[in-house]
From Swiss-Prot:
Domain Death, first and last residues per copy: 54-109
Organism whose genome encodes this protein: Mus musculus (Mouse)
Keyword Nucleus recorded: yes
Acetylation among keywords: no
PROSITE patterns reported in the protein's UniProt record: DEATH_DOMAIN (PS50017), TIR (PS50104)
Name of protein: Myeloid differentiation primary response protein MyD88
Localization per record: Cytoplasm; Nucleus
Domain notes: The intermediate domain (ID) is required for the phosphorylation and activation of IRAK.
GO biological process: 3'-UTR-mediated mRNA stabilization; apoptotic process; cell surface receptor protein serine/threonine kinase signaling pathway; cell surface receptor signaling pathway; cellular response to lipopolysaccharide; cellular response to mechanical stimulus; cellular response to oxidised low-density lipoprotein particle stimulus; chromatin organization
Tissue: Detected in bone marrow. Isoform 1 is expressed in testis, kidney, lung, ovary, adrenal gland, provstate, thymus and heart, and weakly in skeletal muscle, liver, spleen and brain. Isoform 2 is mainly expressed in the spleen and weakly in brain.
Length: 296
């Protein structure tokens, strides 16, 4: 096979690309993919066939059809699922005989992957040296050993929670209602609310990662128009999704508690939500949420 051969299969594709997550692809490549895949033509496989190969079901594809840029929404939704990678995307395009896409974009995709790897390597080199053997269930540094109000400062008995609450400051009143309904009732759940439970003075990103991954069994996302503008909430959501590819562990629970002017975030669109705005199901809202948070 010549170097310029656009056909890409599992045997010829650079193996490292299968370890590269889809987030490595920048906006330029995604726009070009949309230009190739959005048009519905009888002579070439479009985004709907790609969605089928990715494992999306009929109703999910029908919902994506309502999006202004279905290919972009498809990639956003797929990148949180198990098995999604740049290498797998190229493999599927080859399977669908979209050699035109591979011929034009493969070099740009490889460039994006190299940039992603370079950035990851730089981040790794900036990390402090750590002891090779670390118990994952217990924080081993002073910084992460006393981050909540009831923490053991020495990190021997870290405070644990049923759920981490991802929210914006403007949504704090609803979070307070969650506390009343879930903590101060017979449910007796323990929520991690940053403004109440996290001590000031440490890095918000490190704390969020520690709490979501090691201290909280699940994460509740309070979705609102303000949430969509929050970089902190965006980080927390994507971090939680990365811990449970394909949402197999039911780790993340989105909540919609008031009407929104903006579109619901695409990365959460395929996760069952708790809708507080639906008058027909509002009476069941807290029971459903409490049971979801009580699952082992």
């Amino acid at each position: 096979m010549s170097a310029g051969d656009p056909r890409v299969g599992s045997g010829s594709l650079d193996s490292f690309m299968f370890s590269i997550p889809l987030v490595a692809l920048n906006v330029g490549v995604r726009r070009r993919l949309s230009l190739f895949l959005n048009p519905r033509t009888p002579v070439a496989a479009d985004w709907t066939l790609l969605a089928e190969e990715m494992g999306f079901e009929y109703l999910e594809i029908r919902e994506l059809e309502t999006r202004p840029d279905p290919t972009r929404s498809l990639l956003d939704a797929w990148q949180g699922r198990s098995g999604a990678s740049v290498g797998r995307l190229l493999e599927l395009l080859a399977l669908l005989d979209r050699e035109d896409i591979l011929k034009e974009l493969k070099s740009r995709i490889e460039e994006d992957c190299q940039k992603y790897l370079g950035k990851q390597q730089n981040q790794e080199s900036e990390k402090p040296l750590q002891v090779a053997r670390v118990e994952s269930s217990v924080p081993q540094t002073k910084e992460l050993g006393g981050i909540t109000t009831l923490d053991d400062p020495l990190g021997q008995t870290p405070e644990l929670f049923d759920a981490f609450i991802c929210y914006c400051p403007n949504d704090i009143e609803f979070v307070q209602e969650m506390i009343r309904q879930l903590e101060q009732t017979d449910y007796r759940l323990k929520l991690c609310v940053s403004d109440r439970d996290v001590l000031p003075g440490t890095c918000v990103w490190s704390i969020a990662s520690e709490l979501i991954e090691k201290r909280c069994r699940r994460m509740v996302v309070v979705v609102s128009d303000d949430y969509l503008q929050s970089k902190e909430c965006d980080f927390q959501t994507k971090f939680a999704l990365s811990l449970s590819p394909g949402v197999q562990q039911k780790r993340l629970i989105p909540i919609k508690y008031k009407a929104m002017k903006k579109d619901f975030p695409s990365i959460l669109r395929f996760i069952t939500i708790c809708d507080y705005t639906n008058p027909c199901t509002k009476s069941w809202f807290w029971t459903r949420l409490a049971k979801a948070l009580s699952l082992p």
